[in-house]
Every structure is written in structure tokens, then in C-alpha cells.
A protein has these predicted regions:
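Residue-level signature of catalytic and energy-coupling elements of molecular machines
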Residues: 40, 54, 92, 107, ...
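Hydrophobic membrane-targeting segments
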Residues: 1-75, 218
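Helix-termination/interfacial motifs at the ends of transmembrane alpha-helices
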Residues: 4, 17-35, 143-221
């Protein structure tokens, strides 16, 4: 089912963008709408890229907020540390179940593996090694979910610049074609071509700037989240290793 969502999303964005471009005079006012429509069909493509970009931005915001879990992530990590300092591994697992999110999933995977190995009375080295492996495996599964669609944002920013440049070139071609056909300077035809060029340039730059800014914002959030998660995982592993030594 999921494999059909992306093509359907692109198709829906295409239909919406073409509709908005075609009815732009009725939607945005006669003067501005007519200018946008006369700038050519590449404006519809820029609108489609903007719609896709906004969709990816909303999806990333919701996903990253969900990845942090139900409560404050720093408070959750501090509470897990307190539980482990008191050798309350079951309590730490319960906190992970209540918090949810990517960090909680990683912590829970390591803690549950630790509990299982302790019940089996496995050697300390095996307990530490397999607990670390469980944390790394869970982290490897969660990280791609945090970074999903970031490449799409970057790609849209790059493509929109090229589309805007293409529209600029086409507008200038129209201007020079008008000069060559009439043999004299026709101000109205010249203005139409220049207007098309500038509108496409502005549209492409707007979509590109928005995409670059949001891409960097999300990359920074993901990097900070991964750093906090790695730091907490390392500390949890050290506490579990110390607890395994104390119980020997």
C-alpha cells in the first residue's frame, strides 16, 4: 500500500498545481493572476514543487516530534539514568514504554536484552557485548526514519532552481523572438517575455530558498537528536556494565 502513496502524492500535487495555475486570475486577482498564468506552464511546475515541499516539511515536523516521544526527552533520559543508578532495570523499561519515540525504542531494546541475558546468567562480557549490539541494531533501525525525506527536500530545492532558470531562458527567448519577428521594438511583447523570465526566476528562488532553509533546520534537529541518543546509549551501557559487575 505504501508504495502507491508517493506516486499518488505526486499525481495529486500535479493536478492541484495545474488547476491553481489555470484558474490563477480567478484565485489571486485579475492583474496578479494574469501575470502568473502568462508566465507559462513552468509556473505550474513550480507550484507543484512548492506543494510537495510543504508536504515534506509537515511530514518531517510531525515525524520528528513523534520521534522525541510523549514527554520531554532530556527529562526522560534523566529518569532512566536514575532508575539504572538504583539498579531498577524493570522500572527503566517501563519508562521507555511510557515515553515511546526513537530514543525510548533504542533504550528499551538494550534494556530488554540485558534483562534476558541476566536471567540466563550469561557471562559479563557476553551481557555487555550483546546489550551494546542490541542498542546499535535498534539505533540503526531508527536513524533512517529520522532522516527520511530529507533528500527529497534537498532535491526539490535544486530542481526548483533549474526550473526557474529554464523559465528565465524561455522568457528571454520569447522577448528576442518578438524583436526578430517585428523588426522593431514592440514594448508590449518585449515586456511579456521579460515578465515571464522574472516571474519564473522569482518562483524558482523562493522554492529553493525555502527548501534549503528547512533542509538545514531538519538536518540540525536530526544531528542533535542522534547526538543526544548516542550519548544516552553510551551512558546506559556503562551503567549496565557496572551493574553486571556488581552482581557478580
Amino acid at each position: 500500500m505504501n508504495r502507491f502513496l508517493v506516486p499518488l502524492g505526486f499525481f495529486a500535487a500535479l493536478i492541484i498545481s495545474v488547476t491553481l495555475w489555470w484558474f490563477m486570475p480567478e484565485i489571486a486577482g485579475e492583474e496578479f493572476g494574469h501575470q502568473m498564468k502568462s508566465a507559462g506552464p513552468l509556473v505550474a511546475m513550480l507550484i507543484m514543487l512548492l506543494i510537495l515541499q510543504i508536504s515534506f516539511v509537515i511530514e518531517r515536523m510531525l515525524s520528528l516530534n513523534k520521534a522525541q516521544g510523549r514527554g520531554s526527552l532530556p527529562d526522560f533520559l534523566n529518569n532512566v539514568r536514575k532508575k539504572l543508578h538504583n539498579n531498577d532495570v524493570d522500572g527503566a523499561i517501563q519508562l521507555c514504554g511510557q515515553q515511546r519515540g526513537s530514543a525510548a525504542n533504542v533504550m528499551r531494546a538494550g534494556l530488554e536484552r540485558y534483562n534476558l541475558l541476566k536471567k540466563e546468567q550469561a557471562p559479563k562480557d557476553k551481557v555487555v557485548a550483546e546489550t551494546q549490539a542490541a542498542i546499535q541494531e535498534a539505533s540503526g533501525l531508527e536513524t533512517p526514519l529520522l532522516e527520511r525525506n530529507l533528500i527529497a527536500l534537498s532535491t526539490i530545492a535544486s530542481i526548483s532552481t533549474m526550473v526557474g532558470l529554464l523559465g528565465t531562458v524561455m522568457g528571454m527567448i520569447r522577448s528576442f523572438a518578438a524583436l526578430g519577428t517585428s523588426g522593431a521594438v514592440d514594448a508590449s511583447k518585449l515586456a511579456v517575455g521579460i515578465s515571464e523570465a522574472l516571474i519564473n526566476t522569482a518562483g524558482g528562488l523562493f522554492v529553493a530558498i525555502l527548501g534549503i532553509v528547512m533542509y538545514n533546520v531538519f538536518v540540525t534537529r536530526v544531528d542533535n537528536f542522534n547526538y543526544m541518543m548516542d550519548e544516552a546509549s553510551y551512558e546506559v551501557l556503562q551503567l549496565l556494565a557496572a551493574s553486571a559487575s556488581d552482581k557478580r
